[in-house]
Structures are given as C-alpha cells and as structure tokens.
A protein has these predicted regions:
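Active-site-adjacent structural patch at catalytic or cofactor/ligand-binding sites
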Residues: 35-43, 52-67
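Glutamate identity and glutamate-enriched acidic tracts
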Residues: 9, 28, 52-55, 87, ...
Length: 129
C-alpha cells in the first residue's frame, strides 16, 4: 500500500480527483490529466487514510482522449511511467488482455495512437491545423 503511494510519487504522479493518481501536464493545470492510475480492484480509488493496509493485484494506467497532449505524446509519458512503476514495485507490464506487454504490443499501441492523432488533425478546420 504505502509502497505504491511512494512509487507513484517517485514516478511523477499526484494523488487527486476521484481518489486516484494523475500525471498532470507541465504548466497547464486546468487542462486535466495526461493520464491517470487507478486500483485494479473496484471501485478503483485509493483510500489514502488506509493506504498502508492496501493490498491489490495491480493498477491500471489510462488516458482519456482527447487530452491536454496529442495521444502519441501522452503515450510517450505513460510508457516510461509504467516501466518505472513496474521497476519500483517489482511488477510486470500487462496489456488490456492481461498478457505481457512487449515490443510488438507497444508498437501496436503507438500505431493506434498515431492514427488517432492523424484523424484528429484532419478533422480540424483548415485554419486551426
């Protein structure tokens, strides 16, 4: 429990809204989080008053799109944070199907986010690109 809170802080996450941890964009406080980290166990939040008693099989990192950064830029923040958390907590990175997240899975996520960014860019009016 408290190991998780310490690791989250070391990885640059802040405890906040909805009782979960967030990575906020540098200098853009009102823009919302780049991504967030929730408990895998329902309801997903962390009770900081009882964090030392927390036992959980894992956490999930997620981002809402559109967000304060382009999707691919946000992912380039999520991945090293997830890797740092796994290192600090002696954990493993898993994909959405709970399989090991390897190079191929990471490349697939990057491709999806790159396509999403392109779609968003092409949907903007010409003067806003």
């Amino acid at each position: 429990g408290s190991d998780l809170a310490v690791a989250a802080e070391k990885a640059g996450l802040e405890f906040g809204d909805r009782g979960i941890f967030h990575r906020m964009p540098a200098g853009e406080r009102g823009a919302g989080p780049v991504f967030s980290m929730a408990n895998m166990l329902k309801p997903g939040s962390f009770d900081m008053a009882r964090i030392e008693h927390l036992e959980t099989p894992g956490v999930t990192l997620f981002m809402a799109l559109p967000g304060p950064l382009p999707a691919l830029d946000a992912w380039d923040t999520v991945l090293p944070t997830a890797q740092r958390l796994a290192e600090l907590l002696d954990g493993n990175l898993l994909d959405e199907k709970r399989g090991a997240l390897g190079r191929q899975g990471i490349a697939h996520i990057r491709d999806q986010l790159r396509a999403w960014d392109r779609q968003q860019e092409s949907a903007k009016p010409r003067g806003m690109r």
